[in-house]
Amino acid sequence: TRKKVSEFMGAENAEDVIFTSSATEAANRVLRGYGFEENMTVYVSPYEHNAVMRTLEALRKEKKFKIKVLETDEKGYLNLDDIEYQFMCDEPDFVCINLASNVTGYVLPAERVADMAKEYGAIVLADAAQAAGNIEINLKETNIDILIFAGHKSMYGLFGVGGFITNSRIFDRDKNITPVIFGGNGEDSLNLELSERGISRYEVGSPNIAAIGTLKTAIDTIEKDLSGTQERENRLLKYLIEKLEDIDGIHIFQKPETEEEFQNHIAVLSIGFEKYMSDDAGTILDGEYDIAVRTGYHC
């Protein structure tokens, strides 16, 4: 399974994959294990999960570094020219960027932001929780240092598995990420210190073998027709938007309009109702129409 995940994500080696219980745990392990220092500048996109933002906020209070938000245009898309100017004015030390929003479906230009950040020697962490299985990822061909993933979303694995993958071509995981969880792993058990290098430095305790095992079969299924799935979902997304626009009182957030915008969008859409609170609308759609939606704030 580790080899399958590494190939699917375009990692350099299978050993670059570390399994955790979730993307949330992976984000905490990476961010808490990294050596943030006072006066560092950390950039985030406006689309980060709370697994990233709450962890960074706790660390900011402790370590006294700065957190800045990457600039966007009037539609909420990242503005690369403005970001380039941001980096010139306050050089980045660390950049966190979501590959695809779980709220609006927007696919962020993460690779281009990573290229810009690397000009200043910054470390780049990308969150692929919503993207993995929806878009093609080839980590070793990018300037992204660390990739976080969730197994239960569009990778179609069971709940209880996630992880992080490091780009060993440009990032030394064992040197730069200190373990934050300690325990047994069946290796060198008489030694009270963890290994200084390798998978066993990070994977401790009893892994969720069942959930991890599902990823191999799930990825096999995805790989049979990823491009075909993307095309079908794109058609369904266009159809949904077309029909929603026929209904008065509905607002579509960050609606893709051009073909380029549709290509940079996964099959996730957020809408609002003029006459209903989101929770009320969700209850009506569920109870009267058997339509399942997620309502309220997203994590």
Set out the residue ranges of the language-model regions:
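Pyridoxal 5′-phosphate
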Residues: 1-299
